[in-house]
Amino acid sequence: MINPKIDPSWLEVLRPQFEAPYFAQLKDFLVAERQQYVCYPKGGDIFAAFDRTPFDKVKVVILGQDPYHEPGQAHGLCFSVPAGVAVPPSLVNIIKEINSDLGTQIPLTSGNLTGWAEQGVLLLNATLTVRAHQAGSHQHRGWELFTDAAIQALAQRRTGIVFMLWGSFAISKAQYIDRTRHYVLTAPHPSPLSAYRGFFGCRHFSQCNAILQQQGLAPIDWTRIS
C-alpha cells in the first residue's frame, strides 16, 4: 500500500486519511496479517472501488460491509465477483430485483459489476480487506474510519448522489448524508435471510435512474454485468 492503485481524484480527497496515524497502524496490521494468513482481495484490488469510479464521476453509491472471504471472489467492488466465478446469493437476489424492476433478463450466471463502476456507481465496502474464510476478520482495525471519510467527502463536496443503502449496517451510514443535497434509498439487505422482508420489490434501480434523469444525467445501464 506504499503506492495504492487508486484514481488521482480520490488520492487527493483521501490523502489526509493515508497520512493519519490510524492508517499507519492499519498498514502494520495488514502486513502482519499477510505474513500469517491469506487475505483478500489481492493488494492491487484493495482500492478498486476508488480506482474504477473517480470522485467527480460518482453518481450512485452502493455500500457493502466487507469483502467476500473465499478464494477467487473478492476483487475490490462490493457485491461483485470476477467473471467466471459463481454468483453469490446476495448478488443473485440483486439481479433478480433488477430483472423484476426493469423487465430485463440479466442471466444469473455472471457477477462482475465493473460495468456499473465505470458508469459512476461506487461499489464500496466499509472494510476493504478480510482474512480468508473469516468474515469480518478485519473489521474495527481502521478501514471504517477510512471509508466513512470517503462517504463524508462525497456528502459534503458533491450534490445529487443516489445512496442505495441495504440492511441496517449500510443504513447506519445515512447519518453522514444530508438529504437536502442527496438522495437516500433504503431497503433490507439482499441476503437470502432478509431479501423477502422488502428488498424484493424495493425498485431502487428504476427509482435511481428516474432521479438521475431528473437531474439531466444519463441513467445507469444495470444490465452491464459481465
Annotate the PLM regions.
Residues 2-14:
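Generic N-terminal amphipathic, Lys/Arg-enriched alpha-helix
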Residues 4, 16-165, 169-172, 177, ...:
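A polyanion-binding, active-site-adjacent surface
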Residues 199:
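C-terminal substrate-binding/active-site "lid" region of AdoMet-derived donor-dependent transferases
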